[in-house]
C-alpha cells in the first residue's frame, strides 16, 4: 500500500455508488495483495440490495464512525464506536441503516502475509 501523510482523501479519490444509498471511497489499495482501506457511507433508510448474507474471501475489519447499522438476519443493531473483525468465510448481513452510517473498513487477503 502507498504511504501518505495526513491529507484530504477527496484529492485522490471520490465517492463511488455501490448500490442505492450506499457509497464507498477507497482510501488506499494494494492491487498486488488485495489489501485496501475505505470509507463506506450509508444514507438513512439504505439497505442491502440482496436478502442473503455476504461471505468474503478476505479478512474484513469494520469500525462504525457514526450512525447505526442493523444485521437484518440477526435482528441486531450496531452503533457508533462498535467494531467487527471477520475472518474469510464468515457470513454476515444483509444490512440496513435507519439513520445512516459512516464506517471505516479494511480488507486483507488471507494470503497477503505470504507475499
Roles of regions detected by a PLM:
Residues 88-113:
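Ligand-binding loop in jelly-roll beta-barrel domains
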Residues 40-42, 63-69, 103-105:
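Short, well-ordered beta-strand segments in beta-rich or mixed alpha/beta enzyme
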Residues 26-56, 75, 87-91:
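Conserved short histidine dyad/triad with adjacent acidic residue
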Residues 35, 60, 100:
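Conserved catalytic motifs of the protein kinase core domain
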Residues 50-72:
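Glycine- and acidic-residue-biased ligand/ion/polar-headgroup-sensing regions
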Residues 1-36:
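A short, N-terminal "cap"/entry segment at the start of jelly-roll beta-barrel domains
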Amino acid at each position: 500500500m502507498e504511504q501518505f501523510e495526513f491529507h484530504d482523501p477527496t484529492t485522490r479519490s471520490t465517492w463511488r455508488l455501490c448500490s442505492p444509498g450506499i457509497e464507498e471511497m477507497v482510501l488506499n489499495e494494494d492491487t498486488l495483495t488485495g489489501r485496501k482501506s475505505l470509507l463506506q457511507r450509508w444514507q438513512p433508510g439504505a439497505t442491502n440490495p440482496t436478502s442473503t448474507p455476504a461471505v468474503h474471501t478476505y479478512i474484513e475489519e469494520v469500525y462504525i464512525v457514526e450512525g447505526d447499522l442493523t444485521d437484518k438476519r440477526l435482528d441486531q443493531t450496531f452503533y457508533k464506536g462498535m467494531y467487527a473483525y471477520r475472518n474469510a468465510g464468515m457470513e454476515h448481513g444483509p444490512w440496513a441503516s435507519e439513520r445512516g452510517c459512516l464506517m471505516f473498513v479494511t480488507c486483507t487477503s488471507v494470503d497477503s502475509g505470504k507475499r
